[in-house]
Each structure stands twice: as C-alpha cells, then as structure tokens.
Amino acid sequence: ETCQDVEDETDEMKIIPLFPSTLHAYTVKDFDKEGLLDYIYAEYDFDPEGRTISNRGGWQSSVDYTAEDNPLLDVVERTLRHDFFFRTLKHEDFHIEDLWININRPGAFNHKHNHPGSVFSGVFWINAPKDSGLLVFDNPNAFTMWDEMNSYSDEFQKILPVHPAYYMTPKEGMIVIFPSSIYHKVDLNESVENRISIS
C-alpha cells in the first residue's frame, strides 16, 4: 500500500496515473540479425508445419527454445537479465519459461490473445519491414472507462494516454515486455516481406 500526498506548491494541474499497466521497451545493441535469420529459417525448414495458436497465415515454431542453448535464447536472456530482471524486478529468480519463433508472411496476422500462466510476456523484433503489422494492446478497462475516456480532450489524451487501445509500430532490435494478462494482437502484414520475431 502506498500513500502519497499531492504537494500544492504551484497552481499547475497535476496528473497522477492510478494503477497503470506497464510496458517496458529495450533496444538490443549490435545483435547479429543475419545470423539469427539464418538460424530461424533453418528451424523453419526442419519443421515447416509448426503450430497454430493465435497465428493466421504465418508460421509459429513448435519447439521450446528455452530447453537448450541457442542464439535466440542467448540474445533475449542476455538483454533481459541486464535491463529487466536485475534493474526492474525485486526477485532475481525470474526465468524465461517459453520461447518461440513467429514468421508472419505477407497477409498473416495474430488474433487477440493473452498468456495465462505467465507474469510477463514479450516480443523481440528481428525483421520488421514497414507496414508489416502493428502490435495492438487492448485497454483492460476500456468498458468501464469508456465514458471517461471519451470525455477527455484530444490534447489531454496525448499527455496521458487514455485510449481503448495502444498501437505500437514494430522496430528491429527492440524487445517489448508487458503483463501477460493484457490482450493483444498483431495486425495484418501489408508489406511484401516476412515479419520475423521471437516471443
């Protein structure tokens, strides 16, 4: 429990977000994009069927890449241990429970879903061409806050994002971590290239 007094030292309006959902974004520096892509396409050639969960029109690996050392686990774990586990969490015993590959071909997308049984989920974009599909997060309070959100001016909504959904453009080399309970989807890949990520 936290109690925080609002100091009234100025006449300016104060905005205090109550109970926000947090999204963490990290840039992976100097990652071997071509090496990772070679590894990913070799995995695809080994198991071209993959599995279907939320993906439509694309390929998702059926292998658990946390079971043994591999370049995918190495780059994600190295980044998260330094930037997320140690600097953000109070417990150091968090670990990556599952890791899979996503190849969203042109025209592919992912239905809205979340990840029960996990605390945090995330995505690392390895190849993210322009127009390859936004990552869309649904506001879990969109129904109960609908009238409140529609009452705010456009200017205020820009200051403090209070929208029914949050849209994020994928960026190569970025890892995004978010609460597993939040429903999210991937929009249609409207580019002519594969959008490739690991989650």
Task: Please provide the spans of the model-predicted regions.
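Non-heme Fe(II)/2-oxoglutarate
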Residues: 9-91, 109
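A short coil-to-beta-strand element that immediately follows conserved catalytic motifs
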Residues: 89-99
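Catalytic core of non-heme Fe(II) oxygenases with the double-stranded beta-helix
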Residues: 102-177, 187
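A short hydrophobic beta-strand segment most commonly corresponding to one strand
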Residues: 122-123, 193-199
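Extracellular and organelle-lumenal recognition/adhesion modules and their flexible linkers in secreted
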Residues: 184, 189, 194-196
